[in-house]
Design a protein with these regions (language model features):
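Acidic, aliphatic-rich amphipathic alpha-helical segments
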Residues: 1-61, 107-138
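N-proximal short alpha-helices
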Residues: 55, 65-68
Length: 138
């Protein structure tokens, strides 16, 4: 198994990203009750810009419409940067510190976001020098 080099614009899909994020939330890390995280991708058309994850200890649902629950924390940034976080190319701390990704909500929820949404399990797959050179050159 190996990573593709550079992710092209045609490869950026918020539905795919959100589906994968929702599949990998560890329910043991979710606070008791219902926790809602909203995502806004500010670089995509309005129709696919806003997403919500509704999390409980039993399940995580992904919504492309406002489910009507109070939002615990909002995540705002570009789809490309969120994909980079998911791929492991960009870490949550660096993305947050630099302002690439903004988190809005109580501190305990802002601190939990990186734990709830870690990089993909495939982020640990070593990339070849060719893949990395291509990625770093772009």
């Amino acid at each position: 198994m190996r990573w593709i080099g550079k992710v092209g614009e045609e490869d950026l899909d918020p539905k795919l990203l959100m589906w994968d994020l929702h599949r990998h939330v560890d329910p043991a890390l979710v606070p008791p009750g219902r926790t809602v995280v909203s995502f806004r991708f500010n670089d995509v058309p309005a129709k696919i810009r806003d997403w919500w994850l509704v999390m409980t200890a039993e399940e995580v649902d992904v919504c492309d419409f406002d489910p009507g629950y109070d939002v615990a924390v909002s995540v705002t940034g570009s789809l490309r940067r969120m994909v980079e976080i998911w791929r492991g190319d960009l870490g949550w701390p660096a993305a947050i510190r630099s302002g690439i990704i903004q988190l809005d909500g109580p501190e305990r929820f802002r601190r939990a976001v990186p734990k709830w949404f870690p990089a993909s399990q495939f982020a640990q797959v070593r990339r070849s020098a060719v893949d990395m050179t291509f990625w770093l050159a772009s």
